[in-house]
């Protein structure tokens, strides 16, 4: 048995999709276990760019099965759209399956998400308005619609009627917006169920049988630990657990089955939307990193906020996830910067120096990062494939991260293409 979990360690957009794409070529199964189509995974095959939101990033390379597990919330219309686009480009799609237990994002979830963000105005959480949060709300409230319900006309009818009574009252009385039609939603989703029926399976049985048979299984997270509902910068977080722990409940596997826990972090830090960001660069250098790194959201197109690498938050993320293999991406973006800074401690508002990540989101706005400075490099590293061929200062940068975290960096990414990696050890 060989299991691999790929998780983000910052605020998303670390390059998990590329790493998953690389690892999936050797995988028998690729499994997404949380989130929804609020994710944005960009992978390249030659000059062809694929932006995936709901499908696992490994769908392009995996020779076995790609599974959207029970912890994912599924917009079936978005799923069908992505599958069709993949087919148009000649991609294989007959190996993609969805858990019967996965909850369905309904039209009223998307509207709720949108109306709430509009109402919040300047205090927006910064959601993608894809209905993710409201769908998870209904799941916890035990009124959600699951994929298996799309295959049962009577259950689907009952659940949509019950939900629309509440949601339409909310739309009309509170938001002063138009109500939704039961007939339109019911007929549309009944038809969707028939279209997808051969893809809707008991994924937890499939996955656990594969573990028992010693297959290579890659679990793919979306978003990242600093957006985790419990351990992120609450409330500026997502509605699920993008941690390694989320694999167990999100895919239905025991913790004893998880072996290789791979954490992915950029060589600097980015964030989309609102929330504290201690090392943020609101200057020309921040803009330079944004442009060189093409830091614009794959899902929303929003410019990402940029800043120096924050090892305080990274240590927190590695601890919660139990990371035993580290990946550093976009090292090439830092080329040409004379002096590089890495945050190793925070100075609190009352003058204390701390090296741990606080649970108080409001205090983070007042914390000042304490930096270590390292010399940069000028050499182009995008064609480097052997660690020893990196400039000395680039190696010192990587080794500083390793020493602080006490975790080995097994892979360094130096460009967006699949081949632009420096692999220091094989874990597959």
Where are these regions (language model features)?
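Non-transmembrane, aqueous-exposed alpha-helical and coiled segments at domain scale
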Residues: 1-428
């Amino acid at each position: 048995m060989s299991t691999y979990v790929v998780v983000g360690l910052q605020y998303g957009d670390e390059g998990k999709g590329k790493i998953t794409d690389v690892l999936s070529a050797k995988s028998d199964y690729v499994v997404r276990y949380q989130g929804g189509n609020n994710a944005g995974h960009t992978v390249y095959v030659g000059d062809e760019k694929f932006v995936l939101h709901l499908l696992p990033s490994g769908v392009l390379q995996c020779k076995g099965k790609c599974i959207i597990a029970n912890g994912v919330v599924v917009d079936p219309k978005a799923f069908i759209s992505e599958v069709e686009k993949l087919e148009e480009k000649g991609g294989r799609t007959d190996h993609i399956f969805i858990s019967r237990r996965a909850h369905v994002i309904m039209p009223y979830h998307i509207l709720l998400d949108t109306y709430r963000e509009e109402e919040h105005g300047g205090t927006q959480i910064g959601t993608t308005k894809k209905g993710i949060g409201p769908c998870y709300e209904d799941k916890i409230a035990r009124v959600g619609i699951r994929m298996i319900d799309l295959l049962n006309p009577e259950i689907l009818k009952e659940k949509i009627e019950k939900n629309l009574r509440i949601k339409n009252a909310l739309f009309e009385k509170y938001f002063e917006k138009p109500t939704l039609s039961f007939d339109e939603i019911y007929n549309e989703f009944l038809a969707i169920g028939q279209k997808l029926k051969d893809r809707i399976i008991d994924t937890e049985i499939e996955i656990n049988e594969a573990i028992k048979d010693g297959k290579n299984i890659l679990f793919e997270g979306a978003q990242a630990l600093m957006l985790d509902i419990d351990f992120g910068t609450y409330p500026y977080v997502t509605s699920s657990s993008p941690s390694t722990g989320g694999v167990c409940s999100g895919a239905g596997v025991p913790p004893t089955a998880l072996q290789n826990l791979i954490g992915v972090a950029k060589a600097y830090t980015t964030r989309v939307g609102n929330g504290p960001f201690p090392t943020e660069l609101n200057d020309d250098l921040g803009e330079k990193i944004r442009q060189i790194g093409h830091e614009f959201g794959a899902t929303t197109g929003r410019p990402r906020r940029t800043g120096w690498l924050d090892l305080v938050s990274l240590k927190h993320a590695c601890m919660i996830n139990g990371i035993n293999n580290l990946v550093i991406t976009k090292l090439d973006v830092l080329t040409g910067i004379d002096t590089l800074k890495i945050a190793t401690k925070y100075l609190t508002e009352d003058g204390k120096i701390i090296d741990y990540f606080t649970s108080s989101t409001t205090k983070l706005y007042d914390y000042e990062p304490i930096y270590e400075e390292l010399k940069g490099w000028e050499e182009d590293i995008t064609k480097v494939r052997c660690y020893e061929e990196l400039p000395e200062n680039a190696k010192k940068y990587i080794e500083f991260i390793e020493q602080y975290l006490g975790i080995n960096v097994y892979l360094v990414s130096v460009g967006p293409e699949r081949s632009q990696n420096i692999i220091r050890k094989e874990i597959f």
